[in-house]
């Protein structure tokens, strides 16, 4: 499955998805201005949104801790 990301500079938001985002996904607010996108059928996290992304970098934050566990595999 492909990984997609998009940064909206005007809104200062980073969007990250495993596969194409779906309108059926449910959003759940996590901590630190992070929103998780969850598949309602499987309960698995399909992506996340990080608010105030550039501001974090300007404040010297070089990493963002996400409240999810990821298992990535390489497709052939």
Residue ranges and their predicted role:
Residues 55-66:
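A short, polar/charged loop-to-alpha-helix boundary motif
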Residues 22, 52-55:
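A short acidic/small-residue loop/turn micro-motif
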Residues 26-30:
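Short loop/turn motifs at secondary-structure junctions and domain boundaries
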Residues 8-9, 39-40:
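Short, acidic, Ser/Thr-enriched surface-loop or helix-capping motifs
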Residues 2, 32-35:
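Short loop/turn microsegments at loop-to-beta-strand junctions
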Residues 16-21:
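N-terminal intrinsically disordered, cationic/polar leader segments
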């Amino acid at each position: 499955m492909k990984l997609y990301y998009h940064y909206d500079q005007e809104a200062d938001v980073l969007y990250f998805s495993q596969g194409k985002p779906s309108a059926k996904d449910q959003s759940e607010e996590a901590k630190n201005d992070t929103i998780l996108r969850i598949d309602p059928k499987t309960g698995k996290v399909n992506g996340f949104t990080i608010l105030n992304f550039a501001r974090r970098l300007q404040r010297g934050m070089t990493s963002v801790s996400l409240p999810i566990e990821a298992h990535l595999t390489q497709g052939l």
